[in-house]
């Protein structure tokens, strides 16, 4: 990157890592459920998650009992899974508390589900939004020939996380002058 008037330059003061999915919203008979997995949790900066192991059962969804009758099964998109609660896996309550520290809204935490890493991948890939777009010719206002395309997008309520590394501007100079930030 060049400085003002292209007299010198240096790399940016902020570096961004790849973005990862932490909580993925999926339609269910109970409304949207935000799904995560041990792998997604381990990738966060929360120290307690770094040692999180596999789930006791791989083909189930773990949900907090919310005071009403616990669903025996829950559909996550097209996938129909048995439901287990914190009675079956004590770490579920701790996970909800630790996620709350990240500033995640209570509504999302109350609709939290944890699935195995393998199921998480399938759930995310099967529930991406497919969007269709077309390029419009500005001269005619009509669609351009062969310009219809589709793409997959994350649903609007997806909770993402990434790391930002901020460098101290005092460690940089432009033309032997300190950087003012």
Q: What spans do the regions from the language model cover?
A:
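Basic, Gly/Ser/Thr-rich N-terminal segments that form RNA-phosphate-binding interfaces in CRISPR RAMP
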Residues: 1-181
């Amino acid at each position: 990157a060049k400085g003002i008037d292209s007299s010198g330059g240096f790399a940016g003061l902020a570096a961004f890592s790849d973005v990862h999915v932490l909580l993925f919203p999926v339609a269910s008979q109970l409304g949207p459920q935000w799904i995560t997995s041990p792998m997604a949790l381990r990738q966060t900066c929360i120290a307690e998650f770094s040692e999180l192991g596999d789930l006791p059962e791989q083909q189930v969804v773990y949900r907090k009992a919310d005071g009403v009758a616990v669903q025996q099964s829950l559909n996550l998109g097209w996938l129909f899974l048995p439901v287990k609660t914190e009675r079956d896996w004590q770490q579920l309550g701790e996970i909800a508390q630790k996620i709350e520290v990240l500033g995640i809204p209570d509504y999302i935490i109350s609709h939290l589900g944890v699935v195995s890493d393998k199921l998480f991948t399938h759930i995310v890939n099967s529930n991406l939004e497919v969007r269709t777009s077309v390029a419009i010719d500005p001269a005619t206002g009509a669609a351009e020939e062969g310009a219809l395309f589709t793409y997959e997008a994350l649903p609007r309520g997806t909770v993402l996380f990434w790391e930002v590394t901020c460098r101290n501007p005092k460690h940089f100079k432009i033309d032997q002058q300190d950087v003012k930030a």
